């Protein structure tokens, strides 16, 4: 029993990046009660850090509202064979770097589904960012003007899941389309991407410029 407790203390210290002196001292001089207290304190600290990490991920994601899959109606949703409802709700697609296009008319819950999937990803420790396409293009243009575009691209590259809402709602000019294309290219096979759109695929060329 004591050996198991000592091993658990060492594991906690490694995960918390604490000195190995703590488990050594506990093992050599601590009583069973003291070891039990230290293990509980370490486990509480790990739990608190995990809670704070999830809160930080949620805040950094930039969701416009809080949505979950609780009570979500799949009545108008058709999932492809490669994606199960469980994969969607448990963020299994993020682990596989799978991309999702949520297509359909306004008002059927595309944004709700995207946010719910993103929030679930955050609770599992995945770094996530949410933007409308217009918002992201404007931000990319601003950062380029300020000379900090590469910093933003680096931040976007570090994400596990990138959600782009309202794909195709507003045409994007040529400069904006080039910036947006670079973000999409950076995401290829390195993270998951969710797009919500009411525009059929054959008309996606109109997203980028009015004259295409």
Language model: regions and residue ranges:
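Residue-level preference for the first positions of well-ordered beta-strands
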Residues: 99-101, 161, 194
């Amino acid at each position: 029993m004591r050996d198991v407790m000592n091993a658990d203390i060492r594991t906690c210290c490694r995960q918390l990046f604490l000195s190995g002196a703590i488990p050594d001292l506990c093992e050599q001089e601590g009583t069973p009660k003291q070891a039990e207290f230290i293990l509980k304190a370490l486990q509480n600290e790990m739990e608190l850090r995990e809670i704070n990490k999830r809160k930080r991920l949620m805040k950094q994601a930039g969701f416009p509202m809080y949505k979950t899959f609780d009570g979500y109606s799949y009545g108008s949703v058709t999932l492809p064979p490669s994606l199960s409802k469980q994969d969607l709700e448990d963020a299994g697609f993020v682990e596989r770097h799978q991309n999702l296009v949520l297509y359909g008319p306004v008002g059927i819950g595309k944004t709700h589904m995207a946010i719910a999937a993103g929030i679930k990803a955050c609770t599992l420790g995945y770094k996530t960012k949410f933007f409308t396409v217009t918002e992201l293009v404007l931000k990319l243009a601003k950062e380029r003007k300020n000379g900090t575009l590469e910093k933003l691209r680096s931040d976007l590259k570090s994400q596990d899941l990138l959600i782009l809402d309202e794909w195709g709602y507003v045409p994007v000019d040529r400069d904006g389309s080039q910036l947006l294309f670079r973000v999409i290219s950076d995401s290829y096979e390195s993270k998951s991407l969710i797009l919500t759109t009411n525009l059929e695929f054959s008309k996606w060329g109109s997203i980028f410029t009015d004259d295409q």
